Design a protein with these regions (language model features):
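A Rossmann-like FAD-binding core segment of flavoenzymes
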Residues: 31-52, 59, 136-239
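Rossmann-like NAD(P)H-binding beta-loop-alpha module
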Residues: 96-154, 158
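FAD-site-proximal beta/loop scaffold in flavoenzymes
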Residues: 81-108, 197, 203-257
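Residue-level detector of alpha-helix initiation sites
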Residues: 70-72, 92, 125, 157, ...
Length: 257
């Protein structure tokens, strides 16, 4: 969020390590733009695909560690795939968001459009950080939250002063409210905007929508391999982080004990 808001101006400062630095310091072979598409537990191999070239090959393993993390939740709502509706989970997401935002702000500065607007769906930590940074860029921000308060995990008396601060800053809060649909919008401010329909009957016009409604474990690869999942849908591991396959371990946001 803070690079989108240009509080952190240099993109490189977000990257604590690079493939080159990991190779030099720890002799780790890091292959970026590369995806594991299948696990053969019996043969102890993984099928690998290079994203840019489509080339596929296999690698063998003695022990395998699964650290795929989580992916942002995209509810099955009408219009959810509109290009103005984004999630912020990875660097690539950030780049797309910033490119769209920069273009809208540049058009505003050139007098070709009015105020840039954004809707943030979800008032957790990521959602509020995005709201803060969009506001920092001069964007008119509305936040939509299903719970009756922002920051649902904390007590109401902690959330209340933050809500007052946001409203004083001109950020709109739509609490106990959900996004119901996203419709393409073309008007004097641009032809690639989106209309956000709320279940309250309110409609918000936006140049950008950020979905910050939580994450879910990235487990499709694991499911396809027949590895056991837990009750909440994460990879089930024991106290040694072993999965149901004793040769395969898992760690991070995708696991549950």
């Amino acid at each position: 969020p803070y690079h989108v808001g240009e509080v952190i101006s240099e993109r490189s400062r977000l990257l604590l390590q690079t493939p080159e630095s990991l190779r030099e310091s720890l002799d780790i072979d890091v292959r970026i733009a590369t995806e594991v598409v299948a696990i053969d537990r019996e043969a102890k191999t993984v099928s690998v695909r290079e994203v840019d070239t489509g080339k596929e090959y296999t690698e063998s393993y003695d022990k395998l560690a699964l650290c795929m993390g989580a992916e942002a939740v995209r509810p099955p709502l009408p219009g959810i795939d509109h290009p103005a509706v984004e999630v912020l989970r990875r660097i690539g997401d950030m780049d797309r968001i910033k490119t769209r935002l920069d273009a809208a702000i540049d058009a505003q500065k050139a007098g070709r459009r009015g105020t840039v607007t954004a809707v943030v769906v979800g008032a957790g930590y990521i959602g509020l950080e995005m709201a803060e940074n969009l506001h920092h860029r001069g964007v008119k921000v509305d936040v939509v939250e299903l719970a009756p308060q922002i920051l649902p995990p904390v007590d109401a008396d902690i959330a209340a002063p933050v809500e007052r601060h946001l409203r004083m800053r001109g950020i709109g809060l739509h609490l106990s409210t959900a996004a119901a649909a996203f419709q393409p919008l073309a008007d004097a401010d641009g032809n690639d905007r989106v209309s956000v329909e709320l279940n309250s009957g309110t409609t918000l016009k936006a140049d950008l929508v950020i979905l910050a409604a939580g994450v879910k474990p990235a487990v499709q690869l694991v499911k396809d391999a027949g590895i056991e999942l837990g009750e909440r849908g994460g990879i089930k591991v024991d106290t040694h982080m072993r999965t149901s396959d004793p040769s395969i371990y898992a760690a991070g946001d995708a696991v549950e004990t």
